[in-house]
């Protein structure tokens, strides 16, 4: 029987460091076959439609998120499959919404295009976020 663990809602860089330590302590030494992040790796407030709400940059989010994923990966077995199901906050960075990031810049600021941190993101199988036509509150 295969073993897996799943978490969600890291919201880097505003995550709780004590929660991260607890997670890493509990993952270390496990014999997991799969580790799944169920969305919201990024806080995405740096790409918010609400002006001046971000206390950090998009680059700060990428740096923090990349390190978080690297820390998780470092305590898991080498054969463990890593899956990241994108959430609504992750999707907000790439949303087709000119109030967030202008369309011509969107590909340039994608986390997989950010050379400094993309190596870690690309180690994880990324499953796109699919918005419901009914909306998330229905």
What are these regions, as identified by a protein language model?
Residues 7, 12-121:
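Core catalytic region of metal-dependent phosphoesterases/phosphodiesterases
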Residues 111-138:
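Hydrophobic, aromatic-enriched interface-forming segments
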Residues 2-12, 134-138:
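Active-site-proximal beta-strand elements of phosphoester/diester hydrolases
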């Amino acid at each position: 029987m295969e073993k897996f663990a799943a978490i969600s809602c890291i919201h880097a860089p505003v995550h709780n460091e004590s929660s991260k330590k607890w997670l890493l302590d509990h993952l270390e030494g496990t014999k997991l076959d799969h580790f799944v992040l169920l969305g919201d790796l990024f806080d995405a407030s740096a790409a918010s439609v609400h002006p001046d709400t971000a206390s950090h940059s998009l680059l700060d989010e990428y740096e923090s998120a990349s390190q978080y994923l690297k820390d998780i990966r470092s305590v898991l077995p080498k054969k463990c499959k890593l899956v990241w199901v994108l959430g609504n906050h992750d999707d907000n960075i790439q949303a087709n919404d000119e109030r967030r990031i202008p369309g011509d810049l969107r590909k340039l600021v994608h986390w997989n295009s950010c050379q400094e941190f993309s190596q870690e993101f690309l180690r994880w199988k990324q499953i796109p976020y699919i918005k419901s036509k009914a909306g998330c509150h229905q």
